[in-house]
Amino acid sequence: MCGITGILGNGDSTVVNSMSGNLSHRGPDGFGSFESDLVVGSICLAQSRLAIVDINGSKQPIESEHNCILVQNGEIYNFQKIKSEIQNYPWKTSGDSETILALHRKYAYENKKTYEIPVGKKVGSLIKTKDADKPGNDADKHRSWVSKLDGVWGFALWDPQIRELILCRDPMGVKPLFRTLLPDGTLLFGSEIKSFYAHPEFQAKPDINALAVRLAFEYPLDYTTLFSNVTSVAQGTIETWTIDKEGKAVLTGITRYNQEKVSPEGNWNPNLDAEILLKSLYNGVESRLMSDVPVGVVLSGGLDSSLIAGLSKKVSDSKGLETPDVWTVAGDENNPDMLAAISLAEHYELNHHKKIIDPEKFW
């Protein structure tokens, strides 16, 4: 878990560094920032890093040989496969994030347009070009290469030659990415809304309508947040932004690159299909054990976490990896879930960390 943040419009390194400082709890292993003045306004990017792969390398922001800049939060599970397919790219790191820049260079950079000063119109809380929501908009050209990524991510990529900022989230929206447009047209974005508080022009106001929806349905129905004019970048979505002649951020494109529809099978054969399901889950666990640091499993004692813990053991044994430790928290040593977790940990000979919380501590 890293923390990324940035500004397109009225900002500087002092402000973006403070914004990133508000996310230091997400990434204590390193900090980096980038600032570039534009004709009017500026682009600022920053990251607080939690190092998981390529511990001593892969510092961010990462700059590519085609002069694009990236900050990313997440993991790209198929980065080794992508690296093997893009052999002519001058790799600077052994980490996973750089594959985003390599794909951008190969599929988007060579056929890109020249920079044109956008004409934006205020639509709700945003400033958009007239074609931003139409097929063939600026974000559409990135669908093919982003679709090659397998993982979880929220990233921001700045292309200085056409002054284009790409904001993107993974298909399931595992990694967060929020944005807001200030009254002067400045775009703020980050892994947490908390980062916006460091910008002197941001004013946190409640969104009463969004709050009412949460209370009624207990989950959001759209991409609004409890803060007025602060929204999430949608899962499986690419947004492209640029800056106009007045230094205001303009949305030039928005597109979904992933719209998979998962429907229940009409006929379920447990003798055949259960093995397919288990193999898929095994492959998913195998991908998520990609790490240069120790990995652990939170073991509640329920079916889901028990499956993950058991498969982690099997994957580790087959790959010669260190078996992940498991952790269980309960309010009582005789809690049924704790007993189930102990039983599973003993069965698989897992290093089990048990924490009993005294109920009196809650008062």
Annotated model-derived regions:
Residues M1-V71, E75, Y107, E116, ...:
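N-terminal glutamine amidotransferase
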Residues L8-S13, Q87-N88, K106-Y115, V119-G120, ...:
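ATP-dependent adenylate-handling active sites, centered on carboxylate activation for C-N bond formation
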Residues N88-D96, F202-N209:
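Cytochrome P450 catalytic domain signature, combining two hallmark sequence patches
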Residues W91-K92, W145-S147, Q203, S291, ...:
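Short, surface-exposed helix-loop/turn micro-motifs enriched in polar/charged residues
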Residues S94, G190, A204-K205, G320-L321, ...:
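Non-catalytic, surface-exposed connector residues within folded enzymatic/regulatory domains
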Residues I100:
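Acidic-aromatic/histidine active-site loop/patch
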